[in-house]
Amino acid sequence: MSDPMDTSIADQSFDWKKAVWTLKTSPKTKLFVWKALHGAIPAGEALRARQINVDGKCKRCNLPETIDHLFFHCPFAKQVWTSAPVFPSIEYNGSIVLRNQWINLISRKNLPPTGVEGQLAPWILWGIWTARNNLVFNDKLTSAAETLSKAIYLAREWGTCQTISSPLPAVPPTLA
């Protein structure tokens, strides 16, 4: 496994605030993205590199489960990303490395009628991760369409909750 600090993410010019901490997404999703960008997600090959005796292969396609494979190179992940309602669309021209493509992914515009105000990429990563965990731990296969729909739903729901105005001030009842 390569050292996450050997990539452009370690560059002093990388804007962590813009790339992670100011994303319009839930705090747990921000932390998840931060961990993914640092190579700290417990995917199969990462666990094996830590001497944990697990099968390091992807449960969907049986290839080595690296973070980049899990989120981009697995046929399941490719299907999720290519179906994502963003502009410009995600194209696969060679190898995609999460740490090198993150700013590009969060810069994409959501197409209507998603109703998502912020970036969709963090929610898609989270959706792929939870679909993977459902397969690994619950033996439940989730389709790419279901994964993408859930990511859009969660992004929209979280955004709606953030824009709900504060409740009206309480007015004591009048005494007659």
Describe each region flagged by the PLM.
Residues M1-A176:
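Primary recognition of RNase H-like, Mg2+-dependent phosphodiesterase/nuclease domains
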